[in-house]
C-alpha cells in the first residue's frame, strides 16, 4: 500500500489524498491493457509497456488510474491462466515509476480457470508500494469499490474519485 503523509485511509471504503489546491492535478487513466505476461503475449506486452512508459514520461501524472482489464489470464491469448503472476508483474512495472496508482477490476482480470479470485488479487494489490486499493464494502457487488477523495490541505474535498468494479460476465455465461 502506498504510504505518504498525503494519503490517509478513513475507513474500508474511503481514502483521503491531499493535493495542491491551486495546481493542476494530472491523472493518467489507462484501460483495457490486457497484459498477459505469458509466452503468447510477450510482444504485445512489450509494446504496451513501451506505450505506457512514453505516456508517463510525456504527461508526468500525479496519479495513474487503471480502469479495468489490466490483466488478461486467458490461455489462448496470453498462454497462461496465472493472474497472480500477472498482477505481480504489473505492480512491479508500475511501482518502478514511483507514482501513486489505483485500479478497479474489469471483466477480464479474473477469467474462468485463473489462479486467483478477485479477493486474492485484492490482497496482492494492497501490497503494491505505490498502489492505493481496498476491497470496499462487503454489501456491494464486486471487489474494490471505494472512494479516493482528492482534498486540499484544509481537508476540503476538491474531487471525489469513485472506483467501481465493473464485475464479470452476466448470468448464463460469457455473453
Set out the residue ranges of the language-model regions:
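N-terminal active-site segment of His-dependent metallophosphoesterases
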Residues: 1-84, 89
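Extended active-site neighborhood of metal-dependent phosphoesterases/phosphodiesterases
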Residues: 2-19, 85-175
Amino acid at each position: 500500500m502506498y504510504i505518504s503523509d498525503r494519503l490517509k485511509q478513513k475507513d474500508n471504503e474511503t481514502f483521503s489524498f491531499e493535493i495542491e489546491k491551486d495546481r493542476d492535478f494530472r491523472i493518467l487513466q489507462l484501460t483495457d491493457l490486457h497484459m498477459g505476461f505469458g509466452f503468447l503475449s510477450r510482444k504485445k506486452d512489450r509494446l504496451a509497456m513501451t506505450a505506457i512508459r512514453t505516456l508517463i514520461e510525456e504527461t508526468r501524472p500525479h496519479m495513474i488510474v487503471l480502469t479495468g482489464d489490466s490483466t488478461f489470464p486467458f490461455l489462448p491469448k496470453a498462454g497462461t491462466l496465472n493472474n497472480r503472476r500477472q498482477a505481480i508483474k504489473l505492480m512491479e512495472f508500475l511501482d518502478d515509476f514511483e507514482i501513486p496508482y489505483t485500479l478497479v477490476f474489469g471483466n477480464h482480470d479474473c477469467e474462468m480457470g485463473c489462479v486467483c479470485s478477485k479477493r486474492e488479487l485484492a490482497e496482492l494489490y494492497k501490497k503494491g508500494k505505490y498502489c492505493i486499493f481496498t476491497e470496499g464494502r462487503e454489501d456491494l457487488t464486486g471487489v474494490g469499490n471505494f472512494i479516493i477523495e482528492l482534498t486540499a490541505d484544509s481537508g476540503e474535498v476538491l474531487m471525489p474519485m469513485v472506483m467501481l468494479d465493473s464485475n464479470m460476465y452476466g448470468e448464463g455465461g460469457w455473453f
